[in-house]
Amino acid sequence: MIIKSLELKNYRNYDELSMNFASGTNLLYGDNAQGKTNILESIYLSATTKSHRGNKDRELIKFEENEAHIRIHFEKQGIDHHLDMHLKKNKAKGVAIDRIPIRRSSDLLGQIPVILFSPEDLKIVKSGPSERRKFLDIELSQMERLYLYQLTNYNKILVQRNNLLKQIRFQNNLIETLEAWDIQLVKYGSEVIKYREKFIKHLGKVCQKIHNKLTGGKEKILLEYDRDVGYDSYLTELAKKRQKDLKSVSYTHLRAHETGAY
């Protein structure tokens, strides 16, 4: 995949911008606060639907303007494509590839595979597990469409289970339906864990090779996933925590998506 050109209109500090990229490495340079990071952010946003800075869409639109537009011309498997993204202050963003609307973010992820390294990424090692989970989810969602499917379903079921825990306080007979949600939660949660473990193993091997070069083989680096839960053990542990879940009103204490890499 190659990005050939980028056009911006009313994005951040840009009234209009049109730039072509050369094959190979492209270097952006200039004075501070001139918009270099904004260019990278616009590409990342178009590929993932999210800003790496965590900004809301309205904050990406140039001051005193109501909407912004990003267009990317890219080549994939020898075929040219155009991605258009419209940002509006009071509406959800619109995305289309070759004029065909993209309705779900899951259909966009992986179309333009990107890896962004910014100062914010130091949170992966400096902050808690949530930042590492976020990194895993972004990378895996671009690489494995099935992972995104499993994660999306897991999160939906988790919300439903937590809502059920709240309802059980007022309708105790609903407790009989909890096991059905547990089975679904474990089904998708176990798959999420498997994908993450596989990714961490592969990433660990790559990191070890790079670290060997940097240290002359004198030091070792180890990446581990902190939980090894199979389907049966996950279901058993979830059942053990059921009373605790019920007492907390609407919270599932054993959550597959909150395991992490260390």
Segments the model singles out, each with a brief description of its role:
Residues 1-45:
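Pre-Walker A-like glycine/lysine-rich segment at the N-terminus of P-loop NTPase domains
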Residues 45-49, 259:
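Post-Walker A connector loop of ABC transporter nucleotide-binding domains
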Residues 57-61, 226, 251:
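Short, solvent-exposed loop/turn elements at beta->coil junctions and helix N-caps
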Residues 15-19, 79-83, 221:
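Short beta-strand segments
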